[in-house]
Curated annotation (Swiss-Prot):
Binding site for ATP: K240
Reaction(s) catalysed (UniProt annotation): tRNA(Glu) + L-glutamate + ATP = L-glutamyl-tRNA(Glu) + AMP + diphosphate
Gene3D superfamilies, per database record: 1.10.10.350, HUPs (3.40.50.620)
EC number: 6.1.1.17
Motif ('KMSKS' region): 237-241
Organism of this sequence: Xanthomonas campestris pv. campestris (strain B100)
Annotated Pfam families: Anticodon_2, tRNA-synt_1c
Protein family: Belongs to the class-I aminoacyl-tRNA synthetase family. Glutamate--tRNA ligase type 1 subfamily.
Cell compartment(s), UniProt: Cytoplasm
Protein name from the UniProt record: Glutamate--tRNA ligase
GO cellular component: cytosol
A molecular function GO annotation: zinc ion binding
Role noted for this protein: Catalyzes the attachment of glutamate to tRNA(Glu) in a two-step reaction: glutamate is first activated by ATP to form Glu-AMP and then transferred to the acceptor end of tRNA(Glu).
Length: 467
């Protein structure tokens, strides 16, 4: 049987990091097994579902590179199908109409709690065979088996058994004419031929209810894999403050999509001690059965390390558009400075994120207006005009502006003055960037451009008072 997985988010908010990991594992499992990956939008919560959330989910999936073979399929476009299946269960005596008011349902639950029993529906309408009538309280309930046990072998958690006596007759159609979650997902997964349901372990309690519906319909029951949650760095549940952010906030923070994919893959799954995986390695090695049954902790330091690895090793040209995105966010005209790929080469050993890279790169895209006072006192003092002047002379004489030629010119200036390279580089570094810290001096000067570099040297000479 062909493996078919699905990712089925509810569009009530953005795609957070836990949802992204679920989508990734579903995608990897399908791709690893040569199967199909389906995207379904579970939008039957009409009060909370929004088009903005749908757009955000689709944008995040595209950014992560998680392409789907079918979809997006919207539950709201399948209401007639859910009604058809509910009618089938009613006709077979496997479901029934119930009309209790909210007050009556509350009284049932309070009575159960008074007996120290689980608060739930008591099955009052189960055997009454009440006909359909126009009533604002009308629901359809599923006749859950009264005896026996639901048993399933979870691909991650192992064997799980739930007694049917623990389950009540749940609502499968609400008064508003919309299906409930537990009913709609069964019909969807059945119709879509889903063979593996991979989701968070907050759904484990739903699984026995859903299995009973599959069996009532005579539908094949898929395999289930329930992943443990992701905890924050202190071992508590993730919050927006501690990492449960919109996936696109990771883009804005300067992480590469494939770095985040690599990190998320390892957040609960492993292959020996290997930390870094190409996409092909993930596709070859991933098996949902190898996912750890214990909760994983978010580690932002490790994510930073993984991201820096890809900043260092990726083709600079492939990183350049993402650096330009970060620069534009800072209000920078990227046409007013060096090629972004050259900036990547200069800075990628010094940063962990593209956001950091962009912040450091601003100096080459805007006029230099501020200087670090300590750097000026130390390196733009009287006497510094000599190496600066010689460097300017050599740079101005270059026929072609390249890193190699800039380097040769600066070394020639140092040699002409019989100075160590540092005596030329440090005042020049302050002249070009206003600080004592920058990449290799040849790259630093090159990125300023011929005209920009000469103007900055002239400004530094004025500062020294030796123009």
């Amino acid at each position: 049987m062909t493996c078919r997985t699905r990712f089925a988010p509810s569009p009530t908010g953005y795609l957070h990091i836990g949802g992204a990991r679920t989508a990734l594992y579903c995608w990897l499992e399908a791709r690893h097994r040569g199967g199909q990956f389906v995207l379904r939008i579970e939008d039957t919560d009409r009060e909370r579902s929004t088009q903005a959330a749908i757009d955000a989910i689709l944008e995040a999936m595209e950014w992560l590179g998680l392409g789907y073979d079918e979809g997006p399929i919207y539950q709201t476009q399948r209401i007639a199908r859910y009604q058809e299946v509910a009618e089938q269960l009613l006709a077979q005596g496997k479901a029934y109409y119930a009309y209790e008011t909210r007050e009556e349902l509350d009284a049932m639950r309070e009575a159960a709690m008074a007996k120290q029993e689980k608060p739930r529906y008591n099955g009052a309408a189960r055997e009454q065979q009440l006909p359909y009538r126009d009533d604002p309280n009308r629901v359809i309930r599923f006749k859950n088996p009264l005896a026996g046990t639901v048993v399933f072998d979870d691909l991650i958690k192992g064997r799980i058994e739930i007694a049917n006596s623990e389950l009540d007759d749940m609502v499968i159609f609400r008064p508003d004419g919309y299906p409930t979650y537990n009913f709609a997902v069964v019909v969807d997964d059945w119709d879509m031929g889903i063979t593996e349901v991979i989701r968070g372990d907050d759904h484990i309690n739903n699984t026995p209810r859903q299995i009973n519906i599959y069996e009532a319909l005579g539908a094949p029951v898929p395999k289930f894999a329930h992943m443990p949650m992701i905890l924050d760095e202190q071992g508590a549940k993730l919050s927006k403050r501690t990492g449960a952010a919109d996936v696109m906030q990771y883009k804005d923070a300067g992480y590469l999509p494939h770095a985040l994919i690599n990190y998320l893959a390892r957040l609960g799954w492993s292959h020996g001690d290997q930390e870094l995986f190409s996409q092909q390695e993930l596709l070859d090695l991933f098996d949902v059965k190898d996912v750890n049954s214990k909760a994983a902790r978010l580690d932002m330091a490790k994510l930073g390390w993984v991201n820096q690895h890809y900043l260092k090793t990726d083709d600079p040209a492939s990183i350049a558009p993402q650096l330009e995105y970060q620069l534009r966010k800072l209000g920078i005209d990227v046409a007013a400075g060096p090629a972004a790929a050259d900036v990547v080469v200069a800075l990628r050993e010094r940063v962990q994120t593209l956001k950091e890279m962009a912040e450091k790169a601003v100096v080459w895209y805007q006029p230099l207006e501020t200087y670090d006072e300590a750097a000026v006192i130390k390196h733009l003092k009287l006497g510094a005009e000599v190496p600066l002047g010689k460097a300017r002379e050599m740079l101005a004489a270059l026929n072609e502006w390249s890193v190699e030629n800039v380097s040769a010119a600066l070394h020639a200036a140092a040699a002409a003055l019989e100075l160590g390279m540092g005596k030329v580089a440090q005042p020049l570094r302050v002249a070009i960037t206003g600080t004592q810290v920058s990449p290799d001096i040849s790259q630093t000067v090159y990125l300023a451009g011929r005209e920009g570099a000469l103007k900055r040297i002239d400004a530094a000479l004025i500062k020294i008072g030796a123009a």
